[in-house]
């Protein structure tokens, strides 16, 4: 479902809000039908705050990495035009980032790690499937080499978040790390590729 909704939202309907909200509604529907909503206790800290907070903030390194490697990636100029076409302009970027920060990490961790994940210490297929749907967004704009790099990084991230959940018996630290990564990456895209001066 994520693959279809993201593709339909971005490349057929051409609306980023439709894509992300449709994706989230799909997660809510599937998790509800499966009866897989985690209990509130799963979001209680599994470690002390002085461990959880620094670990969570480490996710910001994702944005730093994107900023540093963006010149090397040499994304197609069409990416900036597509962002505008998808409805991401000066008026909508900040609400989009806030929505993504507050909603996306929680739903993705519930869907990909809690419901479809496992306590296996080895990589599993779900880690790769989670990484793969991101490539739908990027495939038209970056080279195959960088698509492979992104795929490996995201697969590794999915695996790492599962291990944190397994060791801590809590979803909090991995979700906050995910949140920091999402926000930092979106802020970099907004500041470097976003149409800051579009009305």
What residue ranges belong to the model's regions?
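Cytoplasmic-side transmembrane-helix entry/capping segments in multi-pass membrane proteins
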Residues: 23, 47-57, 116-124
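Transmembrane helix-loop-helix hairpins at the membrane interface
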Residues: 93-199
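Non-cytosolic membrane-interface motifs at loop->transmembrane helix junctions
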Residues: 18-23, 80-88, 144-152
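Juxtamembrane helix-loop-helix connectors linking adjacent transmembrane helices
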Residues: 40-104, 195-199
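Alpha-helical transmembrane segments
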Residues: 1-9, 55-63, 125-129
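Juxtamembrane "helix-exit" motif on the non-cytosolic side of transmembrane helices
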Residues: 8-14, 68-77, 135-141
């Amino acid at each position: 479902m994520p693959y279809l909704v993201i593709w339909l939202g971005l490349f057929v309907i051409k609306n980023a809000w439709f894509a992300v909200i449709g994706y989230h509604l799909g997660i809510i529907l599937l998790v509800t039908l499966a009866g897989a909503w985690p209990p509130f206790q799963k979001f209680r800290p599994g470690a002390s705050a002085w461990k959880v907070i620094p670990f969570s903030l480490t996710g910001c390194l994702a944005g730093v990495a994107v900023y540093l490697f963006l010149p090397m990636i040499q994304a197609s100029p069409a990416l900036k035009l597509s962002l505008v076409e998808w409805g991401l302009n000066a008026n909508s970027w900040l609400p989009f980032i806030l929505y993504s920060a507050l909603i996306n990490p929680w739903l993705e961790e519930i869907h990909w790690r809690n419901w479809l994940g496992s306590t296996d210490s080895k990589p599993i297929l779900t880690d790769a499937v989670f990484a793969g749907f991101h490539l739908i967004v990027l495939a038209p704009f970056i080279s195959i080499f960088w698509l492979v790099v992104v795929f490996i990084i995201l697969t590794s991230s999915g695996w790492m978040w599962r291990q944190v959940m397994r060791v801590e018996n809590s979803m909090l630290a991995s979700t906050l790390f995910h949140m920091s990564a999402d926000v930092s990456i979106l802020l970099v895209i907004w500041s470097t590729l976003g149409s800051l001066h579009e009305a």
